[in-house]
């Protein structure tokens, strides 16, 4: 395809003749454009809901940064393990991740806000939020990833044979792994990377936001203990 595209660049088209790439490449380009639009729409809808929920633009942007983390995680996972991925299933996985990974950020930010309402400083609040919400965040992400592992590796189990003969005929691979594998690995890579960064980057961004807000509105500065 690349050779054809390079040849077409130097080819002078006759009057009234239009040349374009068709077939699988055309379908892939249309699918990629659709998935990009779907991701943008989901991003916008999540942003609107979060702005209404938190009555702020800074906190939703902190939470939505996890979508970027998940995409980076997907690309890193594919690169490190040298996997060949379906563009369609990888795109669907990223769109699905957009609605999953933000939950961890919501848990941290919402709990930190609750602690600040009770009189804690921004530093104490986000520290307590990280300490209190770390277990739920890790358990939820781990359970989700473990649930995707059978799809990712193509685990097959014959329940009918298990009930009748006691032999489940367990094997790995098959036709279904070509369909579900890319989707599952996309979500596993993205969720694991985003969850790890949630517990590090989100609290840092929350404190930076609190510092900037204190300077802009002449509020009490955010104090961070040296120890």
Where do the language-model regions lie?
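C-terminal transmembrane helical bundles of large multi-pass transporters
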Residues: 1-212
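Membrane-proximal cytoplasmic C-terminal regulatory module of class A 7TM GPCRs
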Residues: 208-224
